[in-house]
Structures are given as C-alpha cells and as structure tokens.
A protein has these predicted regions:
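Short loop/turn segments immediately following beta-strands, especially the blade-tip
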Residues: 28-35, 75-82, 121-132, 186-191, ...
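Loop/turn-rich, solvent-exposed surfaces of beta-rich toroidal or solenoidal domains
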Residues: 255-289, 293-297
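Blade-loop segments of beta-propeller domains
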Residues: 38-105
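Loop-centered beta-sheet repeat module
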Residues: 171-226
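A short beta-strand motif characteristic of beta-propeller blades
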Residues: 38-45, 85-90, 138, 143-151, ...
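Beta-rich, blade/repeat-based domains predominating
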Residues: 16, 46-56, 92-103, 107, ...
Length: 297
C-alpha cells in the first residue's frame, strides 16, 4: 500500500454499537482513496469496521468488526488495484475496538470495549487463543440502553500500546475508560502479566495513547483533555504526570468527546480530534510538553 493511499471505514449498523454515532449509517463500509482511485469496497462478513490495522510488511489488513453481541476480526489481503480478498474471520467478543501487532510481528493483541477483555491471536495459527486477561471483578457488560446512561459503571478497556523499556522489556499500557485508569502489563510471549495501574482524575475516560520516547500521551474522551505522562522505569513500571491540557476552547460549553490522538512523523506535533466541537486540536511538542497551536473546525 503506497503512502498516499487512505482506507476509510464507516459504521453500517448503529443498533448493535455500545455508543451512538452522529450522522447516518452507510451501505458499503469501506472506501479506498488515492490520487487515482475512489473505490467503495465490501468484504464478506464486514460490518461496523471500527478499526483497521495494516501489516507493516505483508499486503494484509486486520479489520475489527464491532458489535455489542459478538465482534470479529477479518484478515484481508489486497492486490495492486486494491481488490480485497478475505483470508480469515475469527470471533473476538463484545465490542472489539482496538488491534495492535507485537514488536516481533508474531501476535495480534485485541481489546474488547464492552466486556473489557484482552486477547492474543497468533498470526500463524488458525485457532485464536482465548482471552488472556480477565478482570478480577466480573464485568457485567450492561445492555446498550443502560451503558449509554452511564459509561463508567464498570471497566471498559479501550486500546493497547506496546512500549519497550531500556532493558528491552515489553510493556503494555491499556487505558480503561470505565474506571479512569491506565493498566500496566509485562508482555511476555503470549501472556500479559499485570504489574501496576495508574489512576487518573474521575470522569476522565482515557481512550487512546500515543508514545514518544519515554513519555506517553493519553487522550481523555470524557473530559476533553490530554495528559502527558513520563514512564518511570524502576523495579515496577510506573507513570508520572507532567501536564494536563484541554482539547477545546475555554469558553466552549457544549457537548464534546475526544476521538483519536496521533503524533506526526516529525515528532514535533500532536493532534487530537474533538467530536461535538467538531475540530482538531493541534499542539507543538516542546521538551515533551504540549503548547496549543490551534483548534480548527
């Protein structure tokens, strides 16, 4: 896939989501765009494609299909004309929302939002491994109606990023939107071992994380902030707060939740999307702290 190709995914069934998107449902859920192509794509079994991950070497896409009843991961290959071909389809649980390849490109780590499970799927195995991390306290997985009333009544892991320490140990950071915390795991060959948690402010709702050297940037969906945390590598991995900064103007009083967070290729800028205010907050990274440059709609 060339650098100037974009694949856009869209929800096509709002009724089985754990949230309420704005707009209308689409008919064909995938759109491929580049300088020469505008192509709607459909793949057998593809519904509500919430997250797409490209293999860094192979012409393979991993697509997670989101549902409060049963999520799936599709493995899809493509040719030079971006014709998609389904290679595999596995069940993954309730509201699958995030995918991450490990550093060795041997396993796909999968996060479920509604039941808060994390699972590992070997890339060379047709039979996926069962959930490797279940919360000590039972997650009831409220129905859609009750969940929309209170998204923080129970645990909801939302994503996962891997971090390699100075001693070459693999660490996984998992933001839990429901409990306002960051889970910290040791990641060892098909296993996640809980080692610590970092508590955030109440009603933060941590969603996604971007990594820059020994710092992580967490976008908080519910209170529209970014928190900058330094990774402390002592006996047990911990986090230290460096900065909290808003993603919306001080005088804005309307509804807003944050979406994505990303650091650009130069590592000089960080961008956060706002949903409700319908804008992008752009920050300059200066010695790991953030300086707000603009909030553009």
């Amino acid at each position: 896939m060339s650098n100037d190709t974009i694949i856009i995914s869209s929800y096509n069934d709002f009724d089985n989501l754990a949230h309420s998107p704005s707009g209308t449902a689409c008919i064909i859920p995938l759109l491929v765009l580049n300088n020469d192509l505008f192509k709607l794509q459909d793949v057998l079994g593809c519904y509500n494609p919430a997250f797409i991950l490209k293999h860094p070497i192979e012409k393979i896409l991993y697509i997670c299909c989101e549902s409060i009843y049963q999520g799936n991961i599709l493995t899809v290959t493509y040719d030079k004309f971006y014709n998609f071909k389904l290679l595999g389809n596995v069940k993954t649980g309730k509201s699958t929302c995030y995918l991450q390849l490990d550093f060795e490109l041997e396993n796909l780590l999968v996060v479920n939002y509604l039941d808060s499970e994390i699972s590992i799927h070997p890339l060379d195995d047709d039979i996926p491994q069962e959930s490797i991390f279940n919360l000590p306290s039972n997650v009831i997985s409220n129905d859609r109606k009750n969940h929309l009333i209170d998204r923080q009544s129970e645990s909801h892991n939302h994503s996962l990023v891997l971090y390699k320490t100075k001693s070459y140990q693999d660490i996984a950071f998992v933001p839990d939107l429901g409990l306002d915390l960051i889970r910290i795991f040791n990641y060892q060959k098909n296993e996640l071992i809980p080692v610590n948690t970092y508590q955030l402010e109440k009603n933060s709702g941590p969603r996604y994380i971007s990594v820059l050297m020994d710092h992580i940037y967490v976008v908080n969906e519910l209170n529209s902030t970014v928190i900058v945390l330094k990774v402390i590598e002592i006996d047990i991995i911990n986090l230290e707060e460096i900065q909290i900064i808003s993603t919306i103007p001080e005088d804005y009083t309307g509804y807003n939740t944050c979406g994505n967070i990303c650091i650009d290729n130069t590592r000089k800028y960080l961008i956060v999307s706002n949903r409700g205010h319908n804008s992008l907050a752009v920050y300059q990274i200066d010695n790991f702290k953030l300086n707000l440059l603009s909030i553009k709609d």
